[in-house]
Amino acid sequence: MDAGRRRLVINDCMKPERGRRSPLPRRPTRPPDERSSGIGNLAMTPAKLHMTTSLAPIAVHSPYDGSLLGSVEATDPADIDRLLATARRGAEISRNLPRHKRASILEGAAQMVESRHDAFAEIIVREAGKTIVQARKEVLRCVNTLKLSAEEAKRNAGEIVPFDAYTGSEQRQGWFTRDPLGIITAITPYNDPLNLVAHKLGPAIAGGNAVMLKPSNLTPFSAIKLVGALREAGLPEEVITISHGDRELVTAMIAAREVRMVSFTGGFATGEAISRAAGLKKLAMELGGNAPVIVMNDCDFDKAVEGCVSGAFWAAGQNCIGAQRILIQSELYGRFRDAFVAATKKLKAGDPLQEDTDVGPMISKQVAERTEAAVNEAIKAGATLLCGNYREGSLYHPTVLEGTPLTCRLWHEEVFAPVVMLAPFDTLDKGIEMANDPDYSLHAGIFTNDLNVALEAANRIEVGGVMINDSSDYRFDAMPFGGFKYGSMGREGVRFAYEDMTQPKVVCINRG
């Protein structure tokens, strides 16, 4: 979900230039049969993590200064049969784990992540470029996601079926259980490299499945460290395998007949390709959005400005529910615009490890360059630049536009960058019409003190979630998360992902 909506297009995510200050400490070199797959204390043996190959390792660089952080071994697509054999064993082991054991593993991993909070946060900063403040919040969300998954493992086991509600079935009784699907392929993006992995692994483990995980090649170390915590908490090693590679590997991982579900978070082009290649499988797709926030004349003004600034520029705008289009009622437009621009100019962009940095780098210099090009295209089409559009390598300063033509690509496609567009509207009907304009829709927000207006907007805006008196980017990890229209298939949120990753089995006893 970078400029032009290519967040996890597989060809793009292999090659961007990356970096940070100093490499994370490395372990001593292991013997050839136990080569490290990661950096620092993230190393695992190939038998436990993935297959050793002769392919060139995948280098991982910091988005801030391009320095080398380490590398991961590439997985050869030709090894898919061996990978599947491991996953097959993992699925059998996982389905036979008692629910209390699945729950204790997830709870134990949550405690480990929490106790190693600073180490996890620093890895997120180094490989993803989030500010240290934002990285700490992601770690806390990961802990919560794992705890919610542990609770789901214990309570969502099925229901009694009232067979005697049907004439002629008075002597029948029974229930349905929620059984595992089996093998799930999970593909995760770079923008939330820890918590979005937890959102796939946690419910899958709770449901008794095995997972073939492919994290973004740009941010693999958060995922590796999380898998390490799960195994340390008692998860059998075969239950999760991690692979690193490109389009050919992903195609092999999703096309295999034994894979029963593909869970993907990323770009539209890749999502379409996956849906064509997957065949008869369950699909869970979170393909992004183009979030509108409506600001009404009667809103709490300071709260609206603060919420919209945060919603637009959190994580350098690399947030699928971040505010991209802020629609302001006409009487308030000039005042809001001036206050919003003034607040935006106060944001500090720079080194993400500094506590006072508000906006870190984008994931790569190439992505920042594409963002700059998209903004310049909008300006050429008639948009007015209010601030920003200044790039230093991968650091793209917060950018605000007004007067963006509604036919412009920037208006219709997901920006996935620290870029926001302001536009006035007269009536609520017009604001809702503008909010619903793009094809992509995850979240929206509205600021108003009129409950009837808020509920009218919530009813008519075509999105998966409407945040009232909040920016569009609010998310609680237990709620259903997904979009309307073209933007997604299925829902994340622990309970809802768990239900997607399990299948009902009916047991009926005839006592007659």
UniProtKB/Swiss-Prot annotation:
<comment type="function">
    <text>Could be a succinate-semialdehyde dehydrogenase (NADP(+)).</text>
</comment>
<feature type="region of interest" description="Disordered">
    <location>
        <begin position="14"/>
        <end position="41"/>
    </location>
</feature>
<dbReference type="GO" id="GO:0009450">
    <property type="term" value="P:gamma-aminobutyric acid catabolic process"/>
</dbReference>
<dbReference type="InterPro" id="IPR029510">
    <property type="entry name" value="Ald_DH_CS_GLU"/>
</dbReference>
<dbReference type="Pfam" id="PF00171">
    <property type="entry name" value="Aldedh"/>
</dbReference>
<keyword id="KW-0521">NADP</keyword>
<keyword id="KW-0560">Oxidoreductase</keyword>
<feature type="active site">
    <location>
        <position position="320"/>
    </location>
</feature>
<comment type="similarity">
    <text>Belongs to the aldehyde dehydrogenase family.</text>
</comment>
<dbReference type="InterPro" id="IPR051020">
    <property type="entry name" value="ALDH-related_metabolic_enz"/>
</dbReference>
<dbReference type="InterPro" id="IPR015590">
    <property type="entry name" value="Aldehyde_DH_dom"/>
</dbReference>
<dbReference type="InterPro" id="IPR016162">
    <property type="entry name" value="Ald_DH_N"/>
</dbReference>
<dbReference type="InterPro" id="IPR016163">
    <property type="entry name" value="Ald_DH_C"/>
</dbReference>
<comment type="pathway">
    <text>Amino-acid degradation; 4-aminobutanoate degradation.</text>
</comment>
<feature type="active site">
    <location>
        <position position="286"/>
    </location>
</feature>
<dbReference type="GO" id="GO:0008911">
    <property type="term" value="F:lactaldehyde dehydrogenase (NAD+) activity"/>
</dbReference>
<protein>
    <recommendedName>
        <fullName>Putative aldehyde-dehydrogenase-like protein y4uC</fullName>
        <ecNumber>1.2.1.-</ecNumber>
    </recommendedName>
</protein>
<keyword id="KW-0614">Plasmid</keyword>
<dbReference type="InterPro" id="IPR016161">
    <property type="entry name" value="Ald_DH/histidinol_DH"/>
</dbReference>
<feature type="binding site">
    <location>
        <begin position="266"/>
        <end position="271"/>
    </location>
    <ligand>
        <name>NADP(+)</name>
    </ligand>
</feature>
